[in-house]
């Protein structure tokens, strides 16, 4: 069974998502313990949290999967795969067509593979999903002129501050999302751009790319009080900025705009008590909706590609199901060949002269027979002929 647990921007705001994600983590742990789940991929981004699970023992009627929190979507089978294909194609993103999700899914798969909990089935599904995302982007205009969460945050800042020219901006976080923010800011002719990251050399690298200035994390307060705009996008599990931290500085924050695009959030809402204008991922929805309208006509073509690739994947699953049978068949036939070859050689008077000839002959015969049988097995798999597959498997079982 393929099982998907998820929460995303479509069904929950950022505040709810943080809490639901914790519930979902707990639900996954309970399922993992009960069903000994070893094959799974976890995806966590700024506006979604998902688990993809492959386990043939899970009971769909289990009370654990009748979860009380309706904001956790629990999905099974083919619809899970199609959802993943839509996601890698950018159709499920808040910013439709954005390219970052493709890298995020690829990273999640690689992490699962490295940690040895991405088996043959999930590896096939995710490899195909990444391929689908690339094909959709190559064959449609879904990502033409595409914006990202980072550039959408900069657009939001311009709506509230006007032109960013000669403004002083602090970017907190120099990871992938922080780099997207910085890339969008680089075109704005700023007065100054400062980059803060917990690992200082990473901040230095990004700041150098922008002709900006790197900031030590423990000196953040000094730069907060001089900034016109702060955009935060770290992977921290806790708040980076809150009212208490701001009060320790001498700044006047009544004209300060903060945009928090992290999940979990980096900036506590209590900073608003000091006059800060604070926005988060939920506030990007208006920009996201405008972007979706521009790309709506690309949806149908993308969906057609998804359907075609899904059909190809389903066909490949049929072959995966008989791979072990074919491998065992090959071993069984080779064992027979070796035994019979040894018997024949033992009866020869001039062993050295004839052994190699007999070995090559029997090997050639087995290869030809094996090719024909394996071809029939694959054909039976494509035609869903389970009876023939089981018959062949039974014939070559170890007795």
From Swiss-Prot:
GO terms (BP aspect): protoporphyrinogen IX biosynthetic process from glutamate
This protein's pathway: Porphyrin-containing compound metabolism; protoporphyrin-IX biosynthesis; 5-aminolevulinate from L-glutamyl-tRNA(Glu): step 1/2
Catalytic activity line of the entry: (S)-4-amino-5-oxopentanoate + tRNA(Glu) + NADP(+) = L-glutamyl-tRNA(Glu) + NADPH + H(+)
Gene3D superfamilies: Glutamyl-tRNA reductase, N-terminal domain (3.30.460.30), NAD(P)-binding Rossmann-like Domain (3.40.50.720)
Record note on quaternary structure: Homodimer.
NCBIfam families the record matches: hemA (TIGR01035)
Protein name, as recorded: Glutamyl-tRNA reductase
Originating organism: Methanobrevibacter smithii (strain ATCC 35061 / DSM 861 / OCM 144 / PS)
Encoding gene, per UniProt annotation: hemA
């Amino acid at each position: 069974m393929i099982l998907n647990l998820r929460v995303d921007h479509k069904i929950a705001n950022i505040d709810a998502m943080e809490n639901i994600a914790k519930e979902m983590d707990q639900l996954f742990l309970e399922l993992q313990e009960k069903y000994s789940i070893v094959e799974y991929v976890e995806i966590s981004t700024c506006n979604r949290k998902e688990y993809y699970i492959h386990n043939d023992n899970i009971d769909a009627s289990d009370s654990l999967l009748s979860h009380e929190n309706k904001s956790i979507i629990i999905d099974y089978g083919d619809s899970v795969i199609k959802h993943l294909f839509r996601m890698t194609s950018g159709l499920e993103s808040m910013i439709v067509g954005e390219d970052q999700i493709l890298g995020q899914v690829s990273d999640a798969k690689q992490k699962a593979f490295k940690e040895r909990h991405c088996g043959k089935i999930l590896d096939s599904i995710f490899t195909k999903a990444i391929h689908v995302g690339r094909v959709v982007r190559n064959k449609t205009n879904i990502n033409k002129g595409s914006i990202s969460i980072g550039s959408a945050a900069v657009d939001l800042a311009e709506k509230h501050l006007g032109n960013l020219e000669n403004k002083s901006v602090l970017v907190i976080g120099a990871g992938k999302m922080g780099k997207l923010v910085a890339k969008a800011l680089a075109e704005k002719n700023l007065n100054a751009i400062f980059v803060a990251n917990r690992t200082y050399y990473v901040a230095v690298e990004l700041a150098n790319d922008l002709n900006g200035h790197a900031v030590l994390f423990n000196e953040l307060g000094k730069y907060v009080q001089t900034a016109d705009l702060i955009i935060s996008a770290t992977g921290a599990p806790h708040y980076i900025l809150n009212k208490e931290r701001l009060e320790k500085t001498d700044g006047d924050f009544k004209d300060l705009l903060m945009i928090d695009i992290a999940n979990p959030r980096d900036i506590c809402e209590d900073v608003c008590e000091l006059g800060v204008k604070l926005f988060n991922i939920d506030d990007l929805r208006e920009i996201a909706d405008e972007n979706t309208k521009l790309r709506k006509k690309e949806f149908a073509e993308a969906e057609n590609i998804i359907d075609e690739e899904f059909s190809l994947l389903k066909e490949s699953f049929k072959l995966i199901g008989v791979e072990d049978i074919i491998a065992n068949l090959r071993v069984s036939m080779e064992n027979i060949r070796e035994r019979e070859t040894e018997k024949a050689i033992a009866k020869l008077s001039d062993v050295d002269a004839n052994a190699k000839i007999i070995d090559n002959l029997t090997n050639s015969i087995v290869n030809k027979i094996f090719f024909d049988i394996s071809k029939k097995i694959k054909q039976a798999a494509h035609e869903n002929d389970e009876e023939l597959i089981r018959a062949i498997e039974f014939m070559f079982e170890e007795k």
